């Protein structure tokens, strides 16, 4: 100990003494703990003293004081630790015990909220210690140090024990033994710990466990909540094994202890270890839930399924009339019941269903308060639950539209299912057997007011439906009144109250949320009245949020306005700006959640924007797409994958979560902001084949800015690029010649310039150039040049590539030249007649155009209209156009609209409808320039 200058003693325990010392080598104060001199000759006690130091040294956590040095060869043995200024939790509790009134600062220090944050840190430390296989065995306020700078550390590891170790012979209990020289320390043969903090089973001699540490934490929590012990006894007296502990709420009503925290404390203090928390993590999570303001559910009412007085409306309905997308038989009748009570702003419903009821199908709805008597019960949100072939499916419905679905296999012998639905703030969750199956976020004030149930046989509900209410948070309560006005469409009154809240909470979350909802109210009002000025006013209110901590809400609000106006380019632009500018802002999660919602909304309504939102979701929130949804999305994209040149030329399967999928979605949607990121990724990997794919997509979409910027970058770096074995498909300098060909196509230069370096180009690049050239030549009335191009490049590609990619264009060229015999011969010699009738084959449209050229137009329309309507490939879109039902071009993606215009162009040309044909050229060029989503 000669190295240290002892300043003063700061503590004394059973085996050791703690001194404040100065370390001149490190120029710092330390806490030095040494074994008591009168015990230094006891080898067993010395071993225990060093074990305490080694256990603490092995733990690395902010809640454990680290050990600097351990000196086991000195006399006496000692170890050093950082010196933390502060006081024990016991001294703080002692300062307020049995005090009628407290000074303001002490009242704040010992408030329930302050103590909870301390207790959460204690739990975090014990959770870590347990994860390392260590039991403390003597958790109590004496052993918890509160630093002056918010440190919370656990002291005294003398009783600590590895869970793998058995109880030692030398055990201790914190009870003095009169007349013994060891009166303040471990007594051989006794139980380790302090009786007031020991679990009942521990007092009976049961070995220590995580559960006994949890019990000690329960006593500490009880003291923090009530400022008193859960039971009273004098040390040394016999402790009852069966004791009744009063609820903290009853003991200290003046402390305003939330019922939830009382339940937490009582669960930790349960006499039966099986009833206690299974781990410290579970206890900590409950405390964390309260600290974060998460809902704490308490039962409020019960809906008796078979009692008429609980229901405002009960009638039979044909479910298929209101929810046609659920695939329910049109002849099946279901019972609909709408509750008399209105649900709370935050509500949880709990019920148990028989398997039979789920096999028939069960719906739980949150319809609006108004209009339920007039058939509007399907408005708002709800869940449809169904079991078929031991697969449990859950569909989220909104306004009668299925916007999301998930399915999972279940056990064949399972007959009952516990279901819970939670509505909390912007979150709607469905829980099955205590597992979250689906979460949906909606940041607009909810319209749901009542509770609706759809079922075939009410006896399939086991018991009743329990309605639980959450205590909620300040934000929800202060916004509840204007939200209610908004739900009742009293827009002006809602705006008045929102404005008051915004003015009352400047710079705070509540104020920003109120400002956001002012814009929402104006948007709803404008949508209902059709007032264009109202949309402008809503945009203005959202702009007030600019550069605030809630800045992402400005762009979310604007996106909602543009969505309502049908200005989808501006909608997506707003969302992208938010993601780019505020990626670190907490509110950005609302943008991500909205994008995922829009993906489901557009996909299930077959909207062309679904590809854009799928691309956005893959880029920013891939984890939000589960395996079932992924399978559904890939199935929907199958036709597009088949009709994509860079997918056909690369036979490797396309993974949904790959960069290639992002490129595919960019190509079909015409949405190019992610192309620079894909370029950078492939450039870093030196994947020149993938780079060629990116440049082909940019060229096809007419993104000249990207082509010029990044082709120059490639040219500048080609000379310094070292060709290695990794470059397996083609050399980087081939890209330079590809760029020259693309530029020649855009300038309508002669064919020889487009394919000037064909002899050194890889066939993939040749086919990319040909595809770009052929489409440009055909739509601009130069279809005959396609034949010249084929003659030039035919010898550089394989026979299979000729058949798949050149032959269809050769037929198109002869259709343009109206050479009916040549077209017919090419069809007969290269395609079986069965393929002429297969809309998945290129021959289907080519044959239809040949019929338009040589036969009556009605025959060509009849042929083309024979295409399948359920899964129409992009290569056969003209078939949908010719069908009696027609095709909704507004639902087609950017690339589908271009393909349809090309097909209509050659079809009208063959029919001799030159004006309609020329209109297609104008529309094609305009679409390429505007590239509207």
Curated annotation (Swiss-Prot):
Tell me the residue numbers annotated for binding ATP: 10-18, 33
Q: Any idea which GO molecular function terms this record carries?
A: ATP binding; protein serine kinase activity; protein serine/threonine kinase activity
- Gene3D superfamilies assigned to the protein according to its UniProt record, in alphabetical order: Phosphorylase Kinase, domain 1, Tetratricopeptide repeat domain, Transferase(Phosphotransferase) domain 1
Reported modifications of this chain:
Autophosphorylated on serine and threonine residues.
Q: What does it catalyze? A: L-seryl-[protein] + ATP = O-phospho-L-seryl-[protein] + ADP + H(+); L-threonyl-[protein] + ATP = O-phospho-L-threonyl-[protein] + ADP + H(+)
- E.C. code: 2.7.11.1
User: Is DNA-binding among this UniProt entry's keywords?
Assistant: no
This protein's record includes keyword Kinase: yes
What EC class does the entry list? transferase
Keywords in UniProt for this one?
Answer: ATP-binding, Kinase, Nucleotide-binding, Phosphoprotein, Serine/threonine-protein kinase, Transferase
* Domain Protein kinase as annotated: residue spans: 4-291
Q: Which Pfam families match?
A: Pkinase
Kindly identify the residues recorded as the active site.
138
Which SUPFAM superfamilies does its entry note?
A: Protein kinase-like (PK-like)
| Family statement | Belongs to the protein kinase superfamily. Ser/Thr protein kinase family.
Role summary: Together with the serine/threonine kinase Pkn1, may play a role in the specific interactions with host proteins during intracellular growth.
Protein name stated in the entry: Serine/threonine-protein kinase PknD
């Amino acid at each position: 100990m000669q190295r240290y200058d002892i300043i003063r003693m700061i503590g004394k325990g059973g085996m050791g003494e703690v001194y404040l010392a100065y370390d001149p080598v490190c120029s710092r104060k330390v806490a030095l703990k040494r074994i008591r001199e009168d015990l230094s000759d006891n080898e067993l006690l010395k071993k225990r003293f060093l074990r305490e130091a080694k256990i603490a040294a092995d733990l690395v956590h902010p809640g454990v004081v680290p050990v600097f040095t351990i000196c086991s060869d000195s006399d006496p043995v000692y170890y050093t630790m950082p010196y933390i200024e502060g006081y024990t939790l016991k001294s703080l509790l002692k300062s307020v015990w049995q005090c009628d009134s407290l000074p303001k600062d002490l009242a704040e220090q010992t408030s329930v909220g302050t103590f909870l944050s301390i207790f959460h840190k204690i739990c975090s430390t014990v959770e870590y210690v347990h994860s390392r296989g260590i039991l403390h065995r003597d958790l109590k306020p004496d052993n918890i140090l509160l630093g002056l700078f918010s440190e919370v550390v656990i002291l005294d590891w003398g009783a600590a024990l590895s869970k793998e170790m058995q109880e030692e012979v030398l055990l201790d209990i914190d009870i003095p033994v009169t007349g013994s020289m060891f009166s303040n320390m471990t007594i051989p043969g006794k139980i380790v710990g302090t009786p007031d903090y020991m679990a009942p089973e521990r007092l009976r001699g049961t070995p220590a466990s995580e559960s006994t540490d949890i019990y000690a934490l329960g006593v500490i929590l009880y003291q923090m909540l009530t400022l008193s012990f859960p039971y009273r006894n004098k040390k040394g007296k016999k402790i009852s094994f069966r004791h009744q502990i009063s609820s903290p709420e009853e003991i200290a009503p003046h402390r305003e202890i939330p019922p939830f925290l009382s339940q937490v404390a009582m669960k930790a203090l349960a006499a039966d270890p099986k009833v206690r928390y299974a781990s410290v993590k579970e206890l900590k999570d409950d405390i964390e839930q309260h600290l974060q303001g998460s809902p704490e559910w308490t039962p409020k009412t019960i809906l008796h399924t078979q009692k008429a007085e609980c229901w405002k409306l009960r009638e039979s309905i044909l479910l298929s009339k209101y929810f046609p997308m659920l695939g329910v038989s049109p002849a099946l009748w279901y019972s609909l019941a709408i509750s008399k009570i209105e649900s709370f702003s935050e509500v949880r419903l709990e019920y148990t269903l028989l398997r039979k009821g789920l096999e028939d199908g069960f719906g739980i709805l949150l319809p609006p308060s108004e209009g339920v008597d007039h058939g509007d019960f399907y408005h708002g949100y709800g869940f449809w639950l169904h079991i078929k072939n031991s697969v449990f499916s859950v569909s989220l419905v909104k306004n009668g539209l299925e916007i999301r679905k998930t399915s999972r296999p279940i056990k064949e012998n399972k007959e009952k299912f516990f279901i819970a639905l939670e509505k909390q703030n912007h979150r709607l969750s469905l829980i099955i057997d205590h597992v979250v199956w689906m979460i949906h976020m909606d940041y607009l004030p909810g319209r749901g007011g009542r509770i609706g149930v759809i079922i075939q046989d009410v006896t399939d509900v086991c018991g009743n439906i329990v309605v639980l209410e959450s205590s909620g948070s300040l934000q929800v309560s202060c916004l509840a009144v204007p939200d209610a006005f908004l739900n009742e469409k009293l827009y002006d009154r809602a705006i008045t109250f929102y404005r008051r809240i915004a003015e009352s909470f400047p710079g705070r979350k509540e104020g920003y949320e109120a400002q956001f909802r002012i814009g929402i109210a104006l948007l709803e009002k404008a949508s209902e009245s059709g007032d264009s000025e109202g949309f402008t006013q809503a945009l203005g209110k959202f702009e007030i949020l600019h550069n605030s901590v809630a800045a992402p809400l400005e762009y979310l609000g604007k996106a909602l306005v543009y969505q309502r106006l049908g200005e989808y380019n501006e909608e997506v632009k707003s969302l992208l700006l938010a993601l780019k500018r505020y990626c670190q802002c907490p509110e950005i999660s609302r943008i991500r959640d909205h994008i995922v919602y829009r993906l489901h909304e557009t996909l299930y309504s077959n909207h062309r924007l679904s590809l854009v939102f799928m691309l956005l979701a893959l880029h920013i929130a891939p984890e939000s797409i589960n395996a079932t949804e992924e399978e559904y999305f890939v199935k929907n994209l199958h036709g597009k994958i088949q009709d994509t040149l860079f997918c056909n030329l690369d036979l490797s399967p396309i993974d949904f979560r790959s960069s290639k999928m992002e490129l595919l979605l960019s190509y079909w949607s015409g949405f190019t902001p992610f192309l620079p990121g894909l370029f950078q990724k492939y450039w870093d990997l030196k994947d020149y084949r993938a780079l060629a794919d990116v440049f082909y997509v940019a060229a096809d979409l007419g993104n000249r800015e990207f082509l010029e910027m990044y082709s120059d970058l490639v040219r500048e770096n080609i000379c310094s690029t070292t060709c290695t074995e990794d470059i397996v498909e083609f050399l980087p300098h081939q890209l330079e010649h590809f760029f020259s060909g693309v530029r020649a196509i855009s300038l309508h230069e002669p064919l020889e310039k487009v394919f000037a370096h064909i002899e050194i180009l890889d066939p993939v690049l040749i086919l990319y150039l040909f595809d770009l050239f052929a489409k440009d030549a055909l739509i601009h009335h130069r279809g005959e040049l396609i034949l010249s191009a084929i003659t030039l490049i035919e010898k550089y590609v394989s026979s299979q590539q000729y058949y798949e990619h050149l032959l269809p264009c050769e037929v198109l060229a002869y259709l343009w030249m109206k050479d009916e015999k040549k077209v017919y011969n090419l069809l007969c010699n290269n395609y079986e007649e069965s393929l002429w009738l297969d809309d998945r084959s290129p021959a289907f449209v080519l044959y239809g155009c040949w019929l338009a050229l040589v036969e009556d137009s009605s025959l060509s329309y009849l042929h083309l209209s024979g295409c399948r309507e359920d899964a129409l490939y992009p290569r056969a879109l003209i078939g949908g156009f010719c069908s009696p039902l027609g095709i909704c071009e507004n639902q087609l993606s950017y690339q589908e609209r271009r393909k349809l215009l090309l097909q209509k162009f050659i079809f009208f040309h063959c029919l001799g409808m030159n004006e309609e044909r020329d209109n297609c050229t104008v529309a094609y060029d305009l679409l390429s320039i505007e590239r509207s989503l």
